[in-house]
Regions:
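Catalytic palm subdomain of template-directed nucleic-acid polymerases
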Residues: 51, 104-117, 127-131, 259-261
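Short alpha-helical scaffolding segments that buttress acidic/His motifs in well-ordered protein cores
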Residues: 92-100, 122-126, 229
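Generic structural marker for isolated residues within well-ordered, non-membrane alpha-helices
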Residues: 78-82, 94, 105, 123
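Phosphate-binding glycine-rich/basic clefts of nucleotide- and phosphate-handling proteins
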Residues: 119-124, 135-138
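Residue-level signal for cytosolic alpha-helical hairpin/rod architecture
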Residues: 92-93, 105, 222, 256
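Amphipathic, charged-and-aliphatic alpha-helical interface segments
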Residues: 85-103, 244-247
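Acidic, glycine-rich two-metal-ion catalytic cores of nucleic acid-processing enzymes
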Residues: 1-85, 141-258
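Short Lys/Arg-enriched helix C-cap and helix-to-coil transition segments
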Residues: 131-145
Length: 261
């Protein structure tokens, strides 16, 4: 995937159902080698710990409470944040994961089933008490827009190589910006030149591309935090797979933060 996670198809063994009669019957089809048993191991709070790691590394405000707590094996990021923001754990988890995955305010509001006024009050309280999540996200968005890439925990490039126009119109009917085409760099440059030719009646300076970044920007930078989190988590899990293999243990399947042996 774009973040470095593994994906599967035909069949997708990462999404075998586990609940209900059918799910249980499907899982009974998978048998360990003779004389062996299945073992399933996953990371504890892998993605939230990555967020805290980078927030601490950058010295962002609001991380003092987390520094010691997050080294504990049984750390519960969502409960820690709930206590910091003085909200329920359910609300804290919804907001945390929403921000981690680049969810907008309106979608978060709908997920929480709140009115706009109550949602705004909740978000204000959250960001006042837990400022490092939004600050980290904003810093990463700015970095991604400037450099067109991020580096994951293992220094792997996570590129932003699609482009979109900065000129977006707000649609009051759907209460969001109008969708815009997502383009390759070549197509974005072609579109930019066509816009200039139309605007200036074919009288375009030879150095017109110097203004390209004023009108176009890398697409999906609002997901920069998600790219960093999932990309770094993928690095950690893949490294664990290699380490296990070198010790003579063969992972049978990887499901994001979980390894089945």
């Amino acid at each position: 995937t774009v973040t470095g996670r593994f994906s599967m198809s035909n069949p997708n063994l990462q999404q075998i159902p586990s609940r209900g009669i059918i799910g249980k019957k499907m899982r009974e089809l998978f048998l360990p080698e003779e004389g062996c048993v299945w073992g399933s191991f996953d990371y504890s709070q892998q993605e939230p710990r990555i967020v805290v790691h980078y927030a601490l590394k950058l010295g962002l405000p609001g991380t003092d409470t987390l520094k010691d707590e997050f080294n504990k094996d049984d750390a519960d990021f969502h409960q820690i944040v709930a206590d910091m923001a003085q909200i329920s754990r359910t609300m804290a988890k919804t907001i945390n994961l929403g921000l981690f995955y680049g969810m907008g305010k309106i979608k978060l509001q709908n997920e929480l089933n709140l009115t706009r006024e109550k949602a705004n009050a909740l978000f204000s309280a959250y960001h006042a008490k837990v400022p490092f999540v939004r600050r980290l996200s904003q810093d990463l968005i700015e970095f991604a827009e400037e450099h067109k890439l991020l580096f994951t925990l293992e220094d792997r490039f996570c590129r932003f190589n699609k482009w979109e126009t900065r000129n977006r119109e707000w649609n009051n009917t759907i209460n969001r910006y109008e969708p815009v085409p997502i383009l390759t760099k070549e197509d974005a440059e072609t579109a930019f030149k066509a816009e200039l030719l139309e605007k200036f009646k074919d009288n375009v300076a030879d150095n017109y591309m110097q203004d390209f970044d004023r009108y176009y920007k890398p697409a999906f930078t609002y997901k920069a935090l998600n790219r960093l989190i999932q990309g770094s988590a993928a690095d950690m899990t893949k490294k664990a797979m290699v380490d296990l293999y070198e010790q003579g243990i063969l992972p049978q399947i990887q499901i994001h933060d979980e390894l089945c042996l």
